[in-house]
């Protein structure tokens, strides 16, 4: 099971393309279990090179410009790291939408996802149920 967290820039021109700047992930066997492995890679912006004001506030953003690789390289490294995993979790539903948008834009083979879970939605339901 892979928990993924993306950071992205929607660009200052509000073009509608959310360009990924960072892919972070951890591998776990079960929810609540130990972290088995980690992945982190910075992506150099190629499309939206002018940052949206919200993207400027992202921590360690300078890594994307200084150490970042193009998205196709970053995604292929992520796929290699994720291997044949088919269960993915993200903090919010936008991560999967943005990932698919970038994969489509760069004409890359998509991840084979059997199940995609949104922790933010689950956490919200849990908090509501506790009241």
Where are these regions (language model features)?
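A short alpha->loop->secondary-structure connector
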Residues: 103-114
